[in-house]
Design a protein with these regions (language model features):
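Short tight loops/turns at secondary-structure junctions
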Residues: 171-197, 209
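Transition segments tied to proteolytic processing and entry into folded domains
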Residues: 16-176, 226, 236-244, 249-253
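Sec-dependent N-terminal signal peptides
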Residues: 4-13
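A short acidic/small-residue loop/turn micro-motif
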Residues: 163-165, 193-200
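Short, positively biased Gly/Pro-containing turn/loop motifs at secondary-structure boundaries
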Residues: 203-253
Length: 253
């Protein structure tokens, strides 16, 4: 639990004091990206004239969403100098998970707030986090539904509800669930997409999700849900250590 709070505090402090990125789940990062892949930066180019964007050639190792491309554009500076607080520079040879979206010029853009996960650089992220995220993306890439989680949902109760699973162990580190809502945000159905090894844990997680109150994350007055709106959610299990019991959370730490 201490590791969870430490990592969460770092994520939140980064979003508050640097680039205001916020914290996203893996499912939402996948859902709101045009292109998702495990890849490697093989060549960087000079910044485009008058823009804080530079081109980078990539080598795709695994493609999870979108079409194969040979390059992306990075929001930052290729000379690695300080620009804005959101500027980044990714050295050649860096292996990472790329989450990209298209800008108004139809360019695939990655940046500080894209949800990038570096795989061969020293970061405060654990090896287990990287492994979980790669496995999760492989699972999400197999979904029949491609246009998911268009409207983000939120529950202030979920963290406390998942705390009731503290001390319950699982051989698997994550589960994915599909929630179906009415236009009025009433939960109609819930299914296991890629569950935990133990069916008993899936049942308890689904019971928690069923008894949770959900609301729109933003634009509550202007956003209207479609009938039978499907929302996918990822839940993670962290095993016990010497001082703490195992626990479950919606964050991949």
């Amino acid at each position: 639990m201490k590791n969870f709070l430490f990592c969460l505090s770092i994520l939140l402090s980064n979003s508050i004091y640097s680039c205001d990125c916020g914290v996203e789940t893996v499912v939402n990062k996948f859902a709101h990206s045009t292109f998702v892949a495990k890849g490697k930066i093989i060549k960087n180019y000079n910044n485009l004239k008058g823009e804080n964007i530079y081109k980078a050639d990539i080598e795709i190792k695994d493609l999870y969403k979108g079409s194969k491309v040979k390059s992306v554009f990075v929001y930052g500076r290729s000379d690695n100098k300080i620009g804005t607080s959101c500027d980044i520079f990714i050295p050649e040879g860096t292996e990472l998970i790329l989450y990209a979206h298209k800008d108004k010029f139809n360019r695939l853009i990655i940046g500080m707030c894209s949800g990038l996960l570096y795989l061969n650089r020293k970061t405060y992220y654990s090896k287990e986090k990287k492994t979980r995220e790669l496995k999760m993306l492989k699972s999400l890439s197999k979904l029949k539904e491609k246009d998911i989680n268009k409207v983000k949902l939120y529950s202030s109760e979920l963290s406390d509800s998942l705390a009731t699973l503290k001390g319950v162990d699982s051989k698997k580190k994550y589960g994915v669930y599909k929630l179906k809502f009415s236009k009025k945000l009433k939960l109609k159905d819930i299914k296991t997409v890629d569950g935990f090894t133990e069916k008993s844990i899936d049942k308890r997680v689904k019971r928690i999700l069923t008894n949770t109150t959900w609301e729109l994350l933003k634009d509550r007055d202007s956003v209207k849900l479609e009938s039978n709106y499907n929302y996918f959610i990822d839940i993670y299990h962290y095993p016990k250590d010497k001082k703490n019991k195992s626990f479950y959370t919606k964050f991949n730490l």
